[in-house]
Amino acid sequence: MKFVQIVDFETDRFDEMQAVAEEADKRMAGRAGGPTHRLVLRDRNKPGHVLVVIEFDSYEDAMSNSNDPETGKFAQQMAALCTRPPSFTDCDVLDMTEFK
């Protein structure tokens, strides 16, 4: 079953976060069990509020990714750029539909 983690945070340093994420993407490219998709959303009514939806093939892949030291380093770098600590919501994907 596919698994999604939603990361909810606030920042006034989004450009710096993007640079950190791009560098991490390069380091972790091609790694087995990593995320399959990422969607980054900015609240139109509260621009510093950001949600990141990260999809994995399974819960087990997500936990393996979470336990990787490289992921821990990335998470610490990102948290340092937040104006409030991130919160995490773990979700099993029950249905997914594309409307194209």
How would you name each of these model-derived features?
Residues 1-72, 76, 81-100:
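Short S/T/G/P-rich N-terminal loop/turn motif that feeds into the first structured element of a domain
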